[in-house]
């Protein structure tokens, strides 16, 4: 039909048009509906508009990457932000020297989640030890004065027992069976050792014996109730720092759990003594007669360090 185009005509070459004399006025590109400019068939015929000052011209290659100085500034700002976050999350009663070297953990998502979990648990249940005693092990000596590391698993879950040192209980709570077996081994291994009549091992901790549980809190009367909540990752970080930044430490790994946790210890740099756990269930499988306490002192003396007075309780 005259005056109408077929679909095919849109894909056919346009017939040549007659050239008319130039108009005395400058040509202006026409507009279509609502004043929108019609597209020209030849983009090269339309002068390109210059981008405003400060903007890249269309089609120009992307700008060069950030300079080394800019990247360094970004990293420093990020590190400063993490430090501020860590400072807000410092737990109650965390020793200063330990905080200096371990505060990097406080801003990590797992630790923030862990602190939230423990806080929520305390709202609904009795949790041991109380908040100000969870990190007793950081208050007894400077992190750089640690000489011996004894790894435990889980805090005691009875009233007034756990106070932030593995195997240790507060006075006047009687020593639990595992600690009683430790005292029995001491009485045969260390000359003149006498049962102290209590279970508080703070005297060892003040001499540089780190008494560290893998999990640092527990719900009352429910052993292992706070396992796999993040404590293991945090105490792994503690052991890792000591492993990498100290020399000649003596690690006492009693039982398969402690031995697994200490499997990454550099045995060329430190001393590792392993045996069965002092629990009544396993004490006769190697703990009695292990002589770990006298052996520890021999190793410390070889390293030029002052031995532990195991009687000082």
UniProtKB/Swiss-Prot annotation:
Query: What would changing residue 73 to D do, according to UniProt?
Result: Impairs the interaction with RPA2
Return the annotated site residues (Essential for recruitment to stalled replication forks): 77, 84
Query: Which Gene Ontology molecular function entries are recorded, alphabetically?
Result: damaged DNA binding; ribosomal small subunit binding; uracil DNA N-glycosylase activity
Give GO BP annotations, semicolon-separated: base-excision repair; base-excision repair, AP site formation via deaminated base removal; depyrimidination; isotype switching; negative regulation of apoptotic process; single strand break repair; somatic hypermutation of immunoglobulin genes
Q: Which InterPro entries match?
A: UDG_fam1, Ura-DNA_Glyclase_AS, Uracil-DNA_glycosylase-like, Uracil-DNA_glycosylase-like_sf
Q: Where is this site: Essential for UNG2 recruitment to nuclear foci?
A: 88
Question: In chain numbering, where does the site feature Essential for recruitment to S-phase replication foci fall?
Answer: 10-11
Q: What is the effect of changing residue 251 to S?
A: In HIGM5; fully active and stable when expressed in E.coli; mistargeted to mitochondria rather than the nucleus
Record PTM N6-acetyllysine, positions in chain = 295
Q: Give the modified residues of type Phosphothreonine.
A: 60
Q: According to the UniProt record, where is the region Interaction with FAM72A?
A: 1-25
Active site at 154
Q: Where is the composition biased (Low complexity)?
A: 43-53
Catalytic activity as recorded in UniProt: Hydrolyzes single-stranded DNA or mismatched double-stranded DNA and polynucleotides, releasing free uracil; a 2'-deoxyuridine in single-stranded DNA + H2O = a 2'-deoxyribose 5'-monophosphate in single-stranded DNA + uracil; a 2'-deoxyuridine in double-stranded DNA + H2O = a 2'-deoxyribose 5'-monophosphate in double-stranded DNA + uracil
The listed location of motif Important for nuclear sorting is 17-19
**What is the enzyme's class at the highest EC level?**
hydrolase
| Cellular-component GO terms for this entry | mitochondrion; nucleoplasm; nucleus
**Domain of life from the UniProt record:** Eukaryota
Outcome when changing residue 88 to C:
In HIGM5; loss of interaction with RPA2 resulting in impaired colocalization of UNG2 and RPA2 at nuclear foci; no effect on interaction with PCNA; no effect on protein expression and stability; confers resistance to activity reduction by RPA trimer
Phenotype for residue 77 to D: Impairs the interaction with RPA2. Loss of interaction with PCNA and RPA2
Q: Where is this region: Interaction with RPA2?
A: 73-88
Q: Which disease is it linked to?
A: Immunodeficiency with hyper-IgM 5: A rare immunodeficiency syndrome characterized by normal or elevated serum IgM levels with absence of IgG, IgA, and IgE. It results in a profound susceptibility to bacterial infections.
This chain's protein is named Uracil-DNA glycosylase
Which species does this protein come from? Homo sapiens (Human)
């Amino acid at each position: 039909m005259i005056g109408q185009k077929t679909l095919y005509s849109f894909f056919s070459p346009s017939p040549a048009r007659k050239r008319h004399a130039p108009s005395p006025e400058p040509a202006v590109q026409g507009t279509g509906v609502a004043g929108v400019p019609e597209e020209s068939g030849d983009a090269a015929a339309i002068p390109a508009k210059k981008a405003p000052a400060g903007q890249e011209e269309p089609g120009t290659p992307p700008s060069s990457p950030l300079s080394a100085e800019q990247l360094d500034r970004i990293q420093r700002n990020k590190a400063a932000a993490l430090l501020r976050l860590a400072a807000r999350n410092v737990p109650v009663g965390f020793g200063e020297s330990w905080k200096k070297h371990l505060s990097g953990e406080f801003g990590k998502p797992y630790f923030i989640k862990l602190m939230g979990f423990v806080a929520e648990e305390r709202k609904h249940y009795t949790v041991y030890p109380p908040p100000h005693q969870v990190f007793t092990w950081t208050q007894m000596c400077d992190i750089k004065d640690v000489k011996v590391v004894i790894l435990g698993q889980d805090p005691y879950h009875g009233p007034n027992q756990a106070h932030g040192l593995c195997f240790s209980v507060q006075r006047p709570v009687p020593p639990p069976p595992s600690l009683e077996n430790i005292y029995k081994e001491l009485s045969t291994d260390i000359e003149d050792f006498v049962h102290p009549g209590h279970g508080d091992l703070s005297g060892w901790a003040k001499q540089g014996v780190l008494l560290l549980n893998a999990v640092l809190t527990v719900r009352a009367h429910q052993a292992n109730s706070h396992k796999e909540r993040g404590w293991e990752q945090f105490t792994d970080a503690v052991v890792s720092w000591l492993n990498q930044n100290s020399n000649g430490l003596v690690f006492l790994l009693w039982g398969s759990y402690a031995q697994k946790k200490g499997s990454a210890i550099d045995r060329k740099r430190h001393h590792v003594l392993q045996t069965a756990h002092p629990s009544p269930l396993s004490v006769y499988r190697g703990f009695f007669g292990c002589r770990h306490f006298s052996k520890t002192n021999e190793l410390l003396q070889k390293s030029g360090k002052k031995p532990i007075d195991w009687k000082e309780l």
